[in-house]
């Protein structure tokens, strides 16, 4: 059992034998499949995206018409200047002014359409991110416990923060960039052909060279972008873990080990990020070099054609501008491909999470939990976190309504695992657990868990006031009921001594109250919830002896008339239990009340006596 729990712990840290961390060299998943899922996901915004495409195309059309129209003004200015020199005419400034006003109108319309499509696309992107975060949040609440025990918290949080942000930025920039780039490429090509097919052919020669270079860089960088996103999640997990446990790290002088462990992960992230960013940064210089070669060839051929009188000076000016505009969308596409890859890597991780197996929350004909009186039967229960390793081998017990049941045994005996099975955090491999004759699998999970109140060894309080944290047990409770619950848990006295009393704000990890006070607040929360069945997992292990005695009295009053399961290593706290189940290696080896088990002089008696021998020693 101890080995099994160690595996689970390492899985939770994300670096154990079954950790999810992606290793360097692992092949990336299908890029086309990821983009296909993303396109399918944003299908609800199809109308808005079509409008964006129309406005982006319109903006590009107005922008593309400008250079050729402006070239007419250059031609008119050149011809007028030559006529004035020769004495045969003058410069027609009226005609040139009309052309300039027309070009100004084109560019104003282009800017307006570009602004509108940008405004719409930003709204669409944020709605998609909002919807995706909402679905991830809902998904988290439907995930089985085993998922979270095999991953770091930071890795899960990275799906909601880093991955969704990366996806949103990619969508916002890539879609409009691709549309405008393609429209510009097609429009410029048409305008270039209308000026000179020969010069167009010279300019187009650079296109296959550009595409070949882009394909090469994309193929090389795709793997590193996926690694970068993956290990960013691991970094987040380690930072969260170190921050949460910094006192333990300092107490055991493990700063050096922690830093070394972080540096190893950070080195992998650095290598993947460096390579991906280096390769992506190579695209623009390469494309600019190829574009300049094409620009020089076009300028040379245009000069020769102008000498022959085939084209005008204004056409050369317009064509040179089009050559610049022709290479620009290719460069933009090269840049946006980097964003598309990051976006695809992020969407791959998000959809991978959204497609994870969920818990079955409801059943077709659920049993009525409101009729439960507290009878619990464990019938030959067998369970293992892994199918090939059974840790609960043959657990059977009958619990009557209102009984106080203590589950004791050495560390790793399976005590806490039984509680997880009872609340269906996991399902048994074989056998059954029944409440009032109904298998726990016949209840809806949410309703089943409403029947239980829990006080865990690891207390958990939320950021908020003390009043809000206690009221979490029953949200509709009045202030008077909250205070009454605090008094029953013997928490009222210390709460009133705190600055702000019940309105004192707890920070994120509730470090502004002591561990014992945290325990009292969680007990008050359970008292307020007033559940039919109670589970106390090491409930008083973090409280001093004097406080433990007072809490024990309050808990005895609370448990009267309710079925209660108590897990405790300090056997002195459960001597008044109606039934004590003694577990060893996943089996019930003894059961009975305290006096009966001592008379047997068996495993329980050895445990009980050894604790007091340790105290005397």
Predicted regions and their residues:
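Short intracellular "coupling" helices and adjacent cytoplasmic loop segments at the cytosolic face
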Residues: 21-26, 126, 134-158, 162-164, ...
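ABC-type nucleotide-binding domain
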Residues: 362-363, 369-617
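Helix-loop-helix
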Residues: 191-205, 275-348, 353-354
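An intracellular "coupling" helix at the cytosolic face of ABC transporter transmembrane type-1 domains
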Residues: 145-146, 164-171, 175, 183, ...
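Alpha-helical segments in transporter systems
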Residues: 17-19, 36-39, 47-72, 103, ...
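Juxtamembrane loop-to-helix connectors within ABC transporter transmembrane domains
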Residues: 34, 42, 121, 141-185, ...
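Transmembrane helices of ABC transporter permease
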Residues: 44, 48-61, 72, 173-227, ...
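Transmembrane helix-loop-helix hairpins at lipid-water interfaces of multipass membrane proteins
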Residues: 49-113, 194-198, 309-313
């Amino acid at each position: 059992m101890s080995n099994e729990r160690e595996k689970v712990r390492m899985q939770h840290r994300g670096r154990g034998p079954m950790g999810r961390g992606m290793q360097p060299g692992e092949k990336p998943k299908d890029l086309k499949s990821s983009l296909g899922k993303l396109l399918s996901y944003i299908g609800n915004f199809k109308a808005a995206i079509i409008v964006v495409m129309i406005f982006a195309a319109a903006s590009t059309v107005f922008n593309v018409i400008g250079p050729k129209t402006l070239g007419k003004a250059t031609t008119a200015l050149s011809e007028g200047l030559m006529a004035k020199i020769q004495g045969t005419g003058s410069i027609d400034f009226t005609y040139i002014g009309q052309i300039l006003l027309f070009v100004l109108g084109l560019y104003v319309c282009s800017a307006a359409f570009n602004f509108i499509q940008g405004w719409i696309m930003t709204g669409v992107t944020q709605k998609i991110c909002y919807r995706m975060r909402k679905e991830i949040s809902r998904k988290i609440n439907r995930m089985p416990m085993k998922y979270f025990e095999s991953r770091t918290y930071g890795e899960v949080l990275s799906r909601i923060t880093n991955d969704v942000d990366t996806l949103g930025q990619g969508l916002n920039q890539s879609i409009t960039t691709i549309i405008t780039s393609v429209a510009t490429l097609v429009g410029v090509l048409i305008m270039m052909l209308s000026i000179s097919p020969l010069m167009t052919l010279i300019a187009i020669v650079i296109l296959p060279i550009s595409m070949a270079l882009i394909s090469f860089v994309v193929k090389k960088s795709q793997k590193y972008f996926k690694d970068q996103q993956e290990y960013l999640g691991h970094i987040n997990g380690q930072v969260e873990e170190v921050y949460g446990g910094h006192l333990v790290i300092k107490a055991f002088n493990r700063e050096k080990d922690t830093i070394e462990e972080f540096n190893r992960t950070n080195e992998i992230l650095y290598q993947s990020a460096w390579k991906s960013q280096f390769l992506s940064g190579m695209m623009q210089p390469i494309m600019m070099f190829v574009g300049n070669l094409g620009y020089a060839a076009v300028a040379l051929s245009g000069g020769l054609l102008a000498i022959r009188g085939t084209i005008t000076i204004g056409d050369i000016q317009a064509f040179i501008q089009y050559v610049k505009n022709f290479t620009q969308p290719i460069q933009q596409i090269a840049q946006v491909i980097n964003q598309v890859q990051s976006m695809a890597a992020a969407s791959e991780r998000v959809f991978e999470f959204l497609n994870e197996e969920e818990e079955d929350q409801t059943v077709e004909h659920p049993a009525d939990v409101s009729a439960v009186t507290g009878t619990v039967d464990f019938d030959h229960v067998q369970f293992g976190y892994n199918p090939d390793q059974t840790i609960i081998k043959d657990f059977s017990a009958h619990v009557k309504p209102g009984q106080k049941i203590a589950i004791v045994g050495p560390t790793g005996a399976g005590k806490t695992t039984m509680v997880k099975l009872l609340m269906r955090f996991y399902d048994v491999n074989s056998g059954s657990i029944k409440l009032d004759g109904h298998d726990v699998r016949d209840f809806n999970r949410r309703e089943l868990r409403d029947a239980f109140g829990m006080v865990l060894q690891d207390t958990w309080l939320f950021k908020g006031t003390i009043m809000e944290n206690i009221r979490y047990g029953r949200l509709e409770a009045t202030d008077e009921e909250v205070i009454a619950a605090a008094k029953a848990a013997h928490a009222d006295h210390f709460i009133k001594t705190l600055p702000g009393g019940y309105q004192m704000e707890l920070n994120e990890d509730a470090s502004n109250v002591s561990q014992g006070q945290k325990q009292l607040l969680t007990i008050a929360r359970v008292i307020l919830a007033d559940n039919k069945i109670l589970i106390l997992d090491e409930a008083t292990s973090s409280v001093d002896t004097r406080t433990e005695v007072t809490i024990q009295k309050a808990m005895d009053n609370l448990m009267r008339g309710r079925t209660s399961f108590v897990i405790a290593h300090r056997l002195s706290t459960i001597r008044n239990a109606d039934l004590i189940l003694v577990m060893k290696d996943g089996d019930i080896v003894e059961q009975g009340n305290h006096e009966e088990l001592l008379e047997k002089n068996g495993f329980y008696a050895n445990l009980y006596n050894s604790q007091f021998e340790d105290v005397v020693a």
